[in-house]
């Protein structure tokens, strides 16, 4: 089956919003109207009548899918769910990566809230073209122009107003369309599906004229000929205006602003028109960049069906009916059922079923094309952030470097019944989120979960309770410290046990040399002349590595050093693999004591985005946390502070930052490197651990 919709008719968009700005209602209404104007596939053959919609309305459709497809004006719109939480920069960045454009929803009463600032800045970083929808204009206290001012002042954007509300709060009944220069009035009884075009009411004419002139002036900046014609007194017609607005939106010179009330079913159709008219298709986006399998050579794929197949898996979801679903955005080529290559893991995967998620049904696909967003069933190896591609033309679209977790907490199930459920739940969550790890503590037998920050673990524990119904007690968060050797050292260690019968004997001579951060433990076998038989050497390495894992000073792993096994001795009868493993353990313990141990702590790269008024407070607070300021910068009209701060000093930071900036600043942090702990702090830690 050939492609139904050409690529320029695709819109891959996300709806970004603060938690209460009405993201779900807006998405739900979009699906309601698009479902109405388009019978979905052959599933109903015209049975998609109003009654089916009313049940949907009673139930209040909640879109659980990570990507939903709908149709409007001969265009195909894929709506990708963007997470509301910002602490997971990984999540947000990944969803922005697969979007081509975005709609930012704002609450008509509250305007631009801190959370909306955050998501906006992320989208700015990734150069995602976007437009704004000021929602909830039917609420008491709603004020459209105040929201427009906030978009200008708080986000530093240039708002281009396309619609004005007619009536406000409980009298809100329609919109003035500035491009077409007419009024749109919704008819109450049709659930917002019917509206009529009228002349602009007398009392709105002056305001509409002023707003329209301002809009045209901003739009004609995009084209010299249009600008000249306008200055000579010729206004551009509606089609020309739309082209100019599209050009400016894609170039991110301004953001179109629309308004309405999704809950009261007003303003959603103009929003859909604007998505089609102004947001980019996959063809408007530069080719997707990647690297070849060597990890070095740059490579790219154009958005075309003729290019080799490439796609990015951006979300893994568990579905009650088909099990695990892998959502992937296809950037190039086409995908049929069969084998694809997971280039990040270098493993082959079989595509058994491909599904397209509609608002209320799923459609099995035989083929999918560039620009599509599909759910794949039955992927065994693929995790979030992996690239899928044609085996004969491999490419890695994104090296998702998932940072090592830096914070850990112990979790204990409350009852015996929770024990098994907890194991399952944690494994499921770890599959969905690669920056989350589960381990069990060697000595205490406790389950330890590790993640990127306090909020990250809080939310995962919360999901465990809500989605998997597991009740658990959670310990206090711990920093994942590490130990390292203070200087090179040579050790000659003999393990000997003779007590009648066969004994144990093994002698090893090793040089240990500290190496640079991130090098790990490297083992070099430099035995000459068979002083230790080949088969015993892995045992020496095993013993040393395992002992390094349990640490020496306060029980954290010793990292980043080289082991050179230079000499040793064995006994024909008494030597065994076990004897050499014990000798390796002893040598490691002795080496750690002789060399001395330095304590290392994780240092985080922290980025704080704050309004200028609080800049001094933010920097002062950073310094008090042993932070080193790397620099400050201006983004839009906010100040960005970058600093390196030890993780141990970042606990509870979010609450403190909120309190002295009144909730207007936000921060993100990522692991940067391990660094030596100052002596006074290390002494405190030792006495605490003891």
From Swiss-Prot:
Q: Which residues bind GTP?
A: 17-24, 81-85, 135-138
Gene Ontology terms: cellular component: cytoplasm
**Keyword set for this entry?**
Cytoplasm, Elongation factor, GTP-binding, Nucleotide-binding, Protein biosynthesis
Instruction: Name any one GO molecular function.
Output: translation elongation factor activity
Q: Which family does it belong to?
A: Belongs to the TRAFAC class translation factor GTPase superfamily. Classic translation factor GTPase family. EF-G/EF-2 subfamily.
Organism name: Zymomonas mobilis subsp. mobilis (strain ATCC 31821 / ZM4 / CP4)
* GO BP annotations, alphabetical order: ribosome disassembly
Compartments (UniProt record)? Cytoplasm
What role does it play?
A: Catalyzes the GTP-dependent ribosomal translocation step during translation elongation. During this step, the ribosome changes from the pre-translocational (PRE) to the post-translocational (POST) state as the newly formed A-site-bound peptidyl-tRNA and P-site-bound deacylated tRNA move to the P and E sites, respectively. Catalyzes the coordinated movement of the two tRNA molecules, the mRNA and conformational changes in the ribosome.
Q: What is this protein called?
A: Elongation factor G
Name of the gene encoding the protein in the UniProt record: fusA
Q: Where is the tr-type G domain?
A: 8-283
Principal location listed in the UniProt entry: cytoplasm
């Amino acid at each position: 089956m050939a492609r139904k919709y050409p690529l320029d008719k695709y819109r891959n968009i996300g709806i970004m919003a603060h938690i209460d700005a009405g993201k779900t209602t807006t998405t739900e209404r979009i699906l309601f109207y698009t479902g109405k104007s388009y019978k979905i596939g052959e599933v109903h053959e015209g049975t998609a009548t109003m009654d089916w919609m009313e049940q949907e309305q009673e139930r209040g459709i909640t879109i659980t899918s990570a990507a939903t497809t709908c149709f409007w004006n001969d265009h195909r719109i894929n709506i990708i769910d963007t997470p509301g939480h910002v602490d997971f920069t990984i999540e947000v960045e990944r969803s922005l990566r697969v979007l081509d454009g975005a709609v930012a929803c704002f609450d008509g009463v509250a305007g631009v809230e801190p959370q909306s600032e955050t998501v906006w800045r992320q989208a700015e970083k990734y150069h995602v073209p976007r437009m704004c929808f000021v929602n909830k204009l039917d609420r008491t206290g709603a004020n459209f122009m105040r929201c427009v001012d906030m978009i200008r002042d708080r986000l530093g954007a240039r708002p281009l107003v396309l619609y004005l509300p007619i009536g406000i709060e409980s009298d809100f009944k329609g919109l003035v369309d500035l491009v077409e220069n007419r009024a749109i009035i919704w008819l109450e009884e049709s659930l917002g599906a019917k509206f009529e075009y009228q002349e602009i009411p007398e009392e709105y004419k002056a305001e509409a004229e002023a707003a329209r002139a301002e809009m045209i002036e901003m739009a004609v900046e995009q084209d010299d000929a249009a600008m000249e014609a306008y200055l000579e007194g010729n206004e551009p017609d509606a089609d020309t205006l739309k082209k100019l607005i599209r050009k400016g939106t894609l170039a991110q010179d301004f953001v179109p602003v629309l308004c309405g009330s999704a809950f009261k079913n007003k303003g959603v159709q103009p929003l859909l028109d604007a998505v089609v008219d102004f947001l980019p298709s996959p063809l408007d986006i530069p080719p997707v960049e990647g690297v070849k399998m060597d990890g070095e050579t740059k490579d790219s794929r154009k958005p075309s069906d003729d290019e080799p197949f490439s796609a990015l898996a951006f979300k893994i979801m568990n579905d009650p009916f088909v099990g695990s679903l892998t959502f992937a955005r296809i950037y190039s080529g086409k995908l049929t059922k069969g084998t694809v290559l997971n280039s990040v893991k270098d493993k082959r995967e079989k595509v058994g079923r491909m599904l397209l998620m509609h608002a209320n049904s799923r459609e099995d696909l035989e083929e999918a094309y560039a620009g599509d967003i599909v759910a794949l069933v039955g992927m065994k190896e693929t995790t979030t952030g992996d690239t899928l591609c044609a085996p004969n033309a491999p490419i890695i679209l994104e090296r998702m470097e998932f940072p090592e977790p830096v914070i850990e907490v112990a979790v204990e199930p409350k009852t015996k019944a929770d024990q098994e459920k907890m194991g399952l739940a944690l494994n499921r969550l770890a599959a969905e989120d690669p920056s989350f790890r589960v381990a069990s503590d060697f000595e205490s037998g406790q389950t330890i979960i590790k993640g990127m920050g306090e909020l990250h673990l809080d939310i995962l524990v919360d999901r465990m309770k809500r989605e998997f119904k597991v009740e658990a007690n959670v310990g206090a968060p711990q920093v994942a410290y590490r130990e390292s050797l203070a200087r090179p050292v040579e050790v000659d260690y003999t393990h000997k046990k003779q007590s009648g019968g066969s004994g144990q004997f093994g002698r090893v001579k090793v040089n240990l040399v500290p190496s640079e951060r991130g090098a790990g433990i490297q083992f070099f076998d430099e035995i000459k002349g068979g002083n230790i038989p080949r088969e015993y050497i892995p045992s020496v390495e095993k013993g040393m590595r395992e002992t390094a894992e349990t640490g020496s000073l306060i029980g954290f792993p010793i990292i980043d050093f080289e082991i050179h096994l230079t000499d040793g001795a064995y006994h024909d009868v008494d030597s065994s693999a076990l004897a050499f493993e014990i000798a390796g353990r002893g040598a490691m313990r002795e080496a750690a004591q002789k060399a001395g141990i330095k304590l290392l702590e994780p240092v985080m790269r922290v980025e704080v985005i704050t309004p200028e008024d609080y800049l001094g407070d933010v920097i002062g607070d950073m310094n008090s946390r042993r932070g080193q300021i790397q620099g400050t910068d201006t983004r839009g009209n906010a100040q960005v502070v970058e600093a390196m701060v030890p993780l141990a000093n970042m606990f509870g930071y979010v609450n403190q930052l909120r309190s002295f900036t009144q909730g207007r600043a936000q921060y993100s942090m990522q692991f940067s490197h391990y660094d030596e702990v100052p002596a006074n702090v290390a002494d405190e830690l030792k006495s605490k651990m003891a």
